[in-house]
Regions:
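Accessory, non-ATPase domains that flank or precede helicase/AAA+ motor cores in DNA-metabolism machines
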Residues: 1-305
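N-terminal pre-P-loop "Q-motif" helix
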Residues: 315-331
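Conserved lysine of the Walker
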Residues: 345
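Hydrophobic positions on the alpha1 helix immediately C-terminal to the Walker A/P-loop
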Residues: 348, 352
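Conserved helicase motor core of SF1/SF2 NTP-dependent helicases
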Residues: 355, 359-361, 370-377, 388-395, ...
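Conserved helicase motor core of P-loop NTPases
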Residues: 453-619, 738
Length: 740
């Protein structure tokens, strides 16, 4: 570890999002380039830095700074440079020169102890003198606070966020109740706050620790997809987390309820406990669905006549259920169309589109992610977009407390201007997104919800499609007939067999459904590599990158993490000149296939021409979005990913925790996607995870070919296993309450 002391000569580059800075340091030995995370660093400041020398392939020797301390300037020139650097608002180079000329080495003492004397300098009023003193004091306090926070292992960026939020009260908050951080600062959860509390010496049975632990337990259940927990389950989980007796936790439920942080609701299964936000999301969603569910007067005979005319003109043939679906869409404010692969959902949607266009009605179409929206566009010939783009995301819906805004430009105050909205892949839509969508729709708009209710539920909380069907308050048309063209696909035929719980013949006589029996995990991986690199690209006329490995689990010998590490080395090996970046347990390279693993509404994307001209830009990259790494810049510490529609995003290295390799992904993450070929490694696993719906979802992701490699007994057991993990939701009940 090297220690160097000198003045900040020039700031070459600064990333305002994460504080990453490149600057020239001037000391007795000359100039030195320093790189690292520095918050509020200004030219002219005297700093003592600790770090290690590295050699950059382009920029030469640099000092990578691990920690630093800002010192008071020690000579007149440095004091003048610091004051005139822009660090103090209103003080330029010439005014700084006059201040130092007047007070010389005594400058900082005058500013701190006798600030009124600054008015003796030409160009400084008494008011300005006070403002300069306040700014200098604030910067001094901020630096002390940063050093204090970093003692607790808090990163520079998080420390800056904490100080920006609390200011001089930072010490008081941390020493009084550090659990406030978990509630008020994004990026700090209960566990970090708990570590700080332990270091400070706060007792494990303190009131605010228990209250924060209860709330954290509920938040974790939301991450699992639940909207509530029963009291008994909540208390057991919180007790295990806090290592505190249940009897010492239960009494806090009423306190949290009185503070409106949670909602307690009696039910047949016992007392339900909700995070207040999600309780009211369900309630508001149910009410808005009820308000949209209007009936429109139009005679069936008139609708039927128009449908038959459309069939003739568009050269399509609808069966009875498909005609019923079109009629339900015309006559109702909300209708639900569901069915498995090959049952004619797309044909039915096209018939609806033709019908509404014949009535000169405007239609908007959307799906939860970009891949599903693109498939919708290809299937219908009409533009579809993501729900987030439809609603014009302009903030963070997860932080926006105003229910009329929801972090979107399209909301109750600025609703969508259309007659019909068709949403596909509804099984992927979670409660917050459904609420945001409904907030932007006015009664009188027809809402058509399309999906496969046998797919896995959304990654986020809720089970929207199933709850809407279970409420029995909306017209539902379930398509079951497999059309002749689809019958030629064993992917479709076997998917329906799996859904019905029927055994599937694994004789490998199919043209698009194969099962390769293997028992050894390493042999299975070897087969995967052969399939992806040599066999399948030619068979389905696709690139190896287009072939997707889907696996049930994240961990284990055939889990996402291990498979990605192996697949990366074979599909995108290191090469001289190919940039790469290590981050935690991951290593990213240019050319890697990656996935965003959390919603980030603040990430900016842009679409540019080959000449660098920006033709479109926006905000928001979402959980499950997949792209390719196109650039890694170690100088600016950014990694660029190109997503669908050629949207490019620059990630500061600090945000790489939001990305992971995507050569292999979990089946759950594949929802709404379709790939030319899917390869599924399959050995034994936990019964609660290895169930029928998981297998059904995986198989229906393939367009041309499914290959399963592994244990055929596990495959047949999954078909028989209907023990899908149930989610605690109450939307169906809320809807029925409004429907009467």
């Amino acid at each position: 570890m090297e220690t160097v002391k000198g003045y900040v000569e020039h700031i070459v580059f600064r990333n305002e999002d994460n504080g990453y800075t490149v600057f020239n340091l001037n000391n007795d030995d000359g100039d030195l380039t320093c790189v690292g995370n520095f918050n509020y660093l200004s030219e002219g400041e005297l700093v003592e830095v600790n770090g290690e020398y590295v050699v950059h392939s382009i920029y030469g020797t640099q000092l990578r700074v691990l920690n630093y301390e800002i010192k008071a300037p020690e000579d007149l020139l440095s004091i003048e440079r610091y004051l005139g650097s822009g660090a103090i608002k209103g003080v330029g180079a010439s005014l700084a020169g006059r201040i130092v000329k007047k007070f010389r080495e005594d400058t900082f003492r005058i500013i701190e102890e006798e600030p009124e004397r600054l008015a003796e300098v030409r160009g400084i009023s008494e008011r300005m003198a006070r403002e300069i003193a306040v700014q200098v004091e604030e910067k001094k306090d901020m630096r002390k606070a940063m050093i204090y926070l970093q003692k607790f292992g808090i990163s520079t960026t998080l420390a800056a966020k904490i100080y920006q939020f609390y200011g001089p009260k930072t010490y008081q908050v941390l020493e009084g109740n550090p659990y406030q951080l978990a509630d008020q600062i994004q990026g700090i959860g209960f566990k970090i706050a708990d570590e700080i509390a332990t270091k400070i010496g706060i007792h494990s049975d303190s009131d605010f620790r228990i209250r924060s632990g209860i709330f954290y337990t509920l938040q974790q259940s939301v991450a699992e997809g639940h909207v509530y927990l029963t009291k008994d389950v909540l208390l057991r989980r919180a007790s295990a987390l806090l290592e505190v007796e249940i009897k010492d936790i239960e009494k806090y439920l009423m306190d949290l309820s009185m503070e409106k942080k949670i909602v307690l609701k009696e039910s047949e299964e016992g007392l339900r406990v909700y995070v207040s936000h999600f309780y009211y999301l369900e309630l508001n969603t149910a009410k808005m669905l009820h308000d949209l569910n209007l009936e429109y007067e139009e005679a069936n005979v008139v609708i039927e006549k128009k449908i038959h005319q459309i069939e003739k003109e568009a050269e399509m043939q609808l069966d009875e259920k498909q005609e019923n679906a079109v009629m339900a869409a015309v006559r109702n404010g909300i209708m639900i169309l569901t069915g498995g692969p090959g049952t004619g959902k797309t044909t039915t949607i096209n018939a609806m589109i033709e019908y509404f266009h014949s009535e000169n009605m405007e239609i908007m179409m959307a799906a939860p992610n970009g891949r599903a929206a693109n498939r919708m566009t290809e299937a219908t010939g009409w533009e579809a977009q993501t729900i987030h783009r439809l609603l014009e995301v302009n903030g963070n819906p997860e932080e926006d407390e105003n229910p009329n805004r929801n972090g979107f430009a399209r909301n109750a105050d600025n609703p969508l201007e259309t007659d019909v909205i068709i949403i596909d892949e509804m099984s992927m839509v979670d409660l917050p997104l459904m609420n945001a969508l409904l907030t932007a729709i006015v009664p009188g708009t027809r809402l058509i919800l399309v999906g496969d209710c046998n797919q896995l539920p959304s990654v986020g909380p809720g089970s929207i499609l199933k709850d809407l069907i279970a409420s029995e308050c909306f017209p539902v048309v379930m398509l079951t007939r497999i059309f002749r063209q689809a019958q030629e696909s064993d992917i479709v035929v076997n998917a329906h067999k799996i859904n019905r719980g029927e055994p599937v013949l694994l004789d490998n006589k199919s043209r698009d459904f194969f099962f390769l029996k293997r028992q050894d995990p390493n042999v299975i991986i070897s087969v995967l590599l052969t399939l992806i690199q040599k066999k399948l690209p030619k068979y389905v006329n696709a690139k190896p990158y287009d072939i997707q490995v889907l696996t049930p689990m994240r961990k284990g010998l055939l889990g996402v993490e291990r498979l990605n590490s192996i697949l990366q080395e074979y599909l995108n090996p290191p090469e001289p000149g190919k940039a790469e970046k290590e981050y935690g347990d991951h290593k990213f390279r240019v050319g890697d296939k990656v996935m965003q693993i959390k919603n980030n509404y603040q990430l900016e994307w842009e679409i540019t021409t080959k000449y660098g001209l920006t033709v479109d830009k926006g905000m928001g990259i979402f959980n499950g979005d997949m792209g390719i790494v196109t650039e890694i810049n170690t100088y600016t510490e950014t990694l660029e990913v190109e997503y669908d529609e050629k949207r490019k995003v620059k990630y500061p290295f600090e945000l790489l925790e939001e990305l992971e390799l995507a050569y292999a992904i979990t089946i759950h993450k594949s929802q709404g996607s379709e790939y030319p070929a899917v390869v599924i490694p399959l050995l034994s696993g936990p019964r609660q995870l290895f169930h029928r719906n998981l297998l059904y979802t995986a198989i229906t992701r393939a367009r041309k070919c499914v290959t399963i490699v592994g244990n055929d007994q596990t495959f047949q057991e999954m078909i028989r296993n209907t023990n899908e993990h149930n989610r605690n939701t109450s939307l169906a009940e809320r809807i029925r309450e409004f429907c009467g």
